[in-house]
Design a protein with these regions (language model features):
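Acidic/glycine-rich C-terminal interaction modules and beta/coil loop segments
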Residues: 2-72
Length: 72
């Protein structure tokens, strides 16, 4: 139920929370890059990180999360 405010940009600094787009789905994760490998790490430690190749044509960074608005 939270809303996120995203600054549209093509990259984020390592460990920043961003929006990653894979195919037609978007996900909010901490983003880490190591060469051609990108790890999308969830804040929820019970969830498994997603690993994707930077060169995957279905993958892109959609932007950086700059704020979270929580509903009361």
């Amino acid at each position: 139920g939270d809303l996120v405010v995203v600054r549209v940009q093509e990259s984020v600094e390592p460990g920043e929370i961003g929006v990653a787009v894979i195919g037609d789905e978007a996900t909010v994760k901490r983003i880490y890059s190591d060469g051609n490998i990108v790890r999308l790490v969830p804040e929820n430690e019970t969830m498994v990180p997603i690993v994707v190749m930077r060169t995957d044509p279905d993958f892109r960074i959609g932007g950086k999360v700059v704020a979270v608005i929580r509903k009361l």
